[in-house]
Amino acid sequence: MTSEDEREPIFERIRGHEARDVIDERQKFRWRHTTLLNDFHDLQDIHELDTPHATERTQQLETQGYVFEVERRLHHYLSGLYTLLQQQRTLQNGVGQSFGEDLQEVKNEYMRKESSRAVLGLRHYAQHENVLPLQARTSKLERSKSLVVMVDDLHREDDDRDFEQHFGHITKPYFDPSEWVIDNWPDVEQFFEDTIEVMEQQAEEEIDELAQLSEEVDELYEQLAEDYRELQEE
């Protein structure tokens, strides 16, 4: 029969094991990514709606609430992306300093992308101004619609450096923010996967050790069940 003295040390080791924090934070990061993925699909769905060109298209779009709904979904996505980036920063500082440098490089790699700079610039603007200055743009030639922002409209007072950093590489006077989000999504996915990979590689020994301890606990529970059956039979 398994004694309590034999069981207690392994339970204590599991409760205080350093890999538990890594696994918990990794799971939170996965949940945040899943939520962002859902926000991305919501934005992608409305962006791909077949809304044909029509007379007075701007007025028709506004009447249908299309502009408002795109703005709402954009704002939701941009907020979620910022939260994902902030959560990765927490992983750098809160799970183990050994992660800090490598996770920062993962973030830096994402931030170097032109589409990342533009998308995060939109988030920065929306954070301060609440609403993106979307305008309906139609093309009679292509018989299509899109919602765009004029680059100059994103220029906030006293933010010349931030404006150049986020939008200085855009050559046209306007752009479709939803298209930039969609183009940027593969880089978001890479950022997420690289973050997970860094955590798993650097904490591999600790995670494996915790998994081994968990297996030993399962075996103990099986032994306890067997001990209980023996007692019932006496």
Regions found by a protein language model. Name each.
Residues M1-E71, G100-E234:
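Acidic, Ser/Thr/Gly/Pro-rich intrinsically disordered interaction regions
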Residues E69-Q92, L120, H124-Q127:
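Short, hydrophobic, well-ordered secondary-structure elements
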